[in-house]
């Protein structure tokens, strides 16, 4: 695994965003994972949508691994949160968990939310959305 796909990147993938599709096509499905936190956000959105059944089916059909959040992910997220709070530059609670998981596992986070994640030291971030 090389890449962790953020929530907005998965939405872009499902929605046919040309940049995301081009990025994904350069690799194999085993190169990608979805953070459990992002999966939660995606399922929440699906359950709140007018097209609930269709969106749930899309999510259930994704051939990508969902990465469970473990102790080292939590440790990294805690360190990131403390550092950003001390610097007066906090990021959202879900984003800090996703950042912790990506950094703990040495994965590149693919997200359109670069401004938020760029504050995290040692985190590799790419934006594939067009």
Predicted regions and their residues:
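Acidic, PIN/NYN-like endoribonuclease modules and their adjacent C-terminal/linker elements
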Residues: 1, 99, 103-130
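Short, well-structured N-terminal submotif of metal-dependent ribonuclease cores
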Residues: 1-34, 44-61
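Generic structural signal for small/hydrophobic residues in well-ordered secondary structure
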Residues: 6-7, 20, 42, 77, ...
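Alpha-helix capping/helix-boundary segments
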Residues: 9-10, 38, 73, 98, ...
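Residue-level recognition of specific faces of alpha-helices
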Residues: 23, 58, 65, 76, ...
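A general structural signal for well-ordered alpha-helical segments in protein cores
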Residues: 35, 39, 52, 56-59, ...
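Active-site neighborhoods of divalent-metal-dependent phosphate/nucleic-acid chemistry enzymes
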Residues: 65-112
């Amino acid at each position: 695994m090389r890449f962790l796909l953020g929530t907005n990147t998965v939405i872009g993938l499902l929605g046919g965003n040309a940049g995301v599709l081009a990025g994904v096509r350069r690799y194999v499905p085993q190169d990608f994972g979805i953070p459990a936190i992002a999966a939660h956000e995606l399922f929440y959105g699906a359950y709140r949508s007018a097209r609930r059944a269709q969106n749930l089916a899309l999510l259930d059909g994704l051939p990508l691994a969902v990465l469970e959040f473990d102790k080292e992910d939590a440790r990294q997220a805690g360190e990131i949160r403390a550092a950003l709070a001390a610097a007066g530059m906090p990021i959202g609670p879900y984003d800090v968990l996703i950042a912790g998981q990506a950094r703990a596992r040495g994965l590149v986070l693919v997200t359109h939310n670069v401004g938020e994640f760029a504050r995290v030291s040692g985190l590799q971030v790419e934006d594939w959305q067009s």
